[in-house]
Regions:
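Bacterial Sec-dependent N-terminal signal peptides
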Residues: 1-13
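First exposed extracellular module after export/assembly in secreted or surface-exposed proteins
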Residues: 12-138
């Protein structure tokens, strides 16, 4: 038997964060934007138990109004070659219903925010953090 070294760290890494567009109609469930990034994990332990109270993907707003939480899709069965790690493209759709203009201080018709994005694996390892370009709400 020989030991096979994982291609990636057991702490997840995310890279190449992109937005499909930068303007979103606030409170509109039909308008959406796509946030994409690559995720890498050396021990392939992505995907927390949905009953644990934890999530996989965290997107925290710069305005601290609302933080968004998501799960990775469930993968049934073993992942071939998972001992060497796992990598993949992650796509998350955000609707205008999820991001609203902050009018708590004074009424306004537009707003700007950033999202801080990171993932957490089953072992609780937090990935590096990436920030989106500005998202303009109208």
């Amino acid at each position: 038997y020989s030991c096979k070294k994982a291609l990636y760290s057991t702490i997840p890494t995310i890279e190449q964060l992109k937005l499909s567009k930068q303007t979103l109609k606030s409170n509109d469930p039909k308008d959406s934007l796509l946030i994409s990034f690559y995720v890498y994990d050396g021990d392939a332990d992505l995907g927390v138990d949905r009953n644990s109270g934890s999530y996989d993907i965290y997107m925290d707003e710069s305005r601290t109004i609302q933080n968004l939480r998501f799960y990775f899709p469930e993968i049934n069965g073993a992942i071939p070659g998972a001992g060497k790690g796992i990598e993949g493209l992650c796509n998350v759709y955000i609707t205008g219903k999820q991001l609203k203009i902050d009018s708590t201080v004074f009424p306004k018709s537009a707003d700007t925010l950033y999202l801080k994005v990171y993932v957490v694996d089953k072992a609780g390892h937090k990935s590096n953090t990436l920030f989106t370009n500005p998202i303009y709400l109208k």
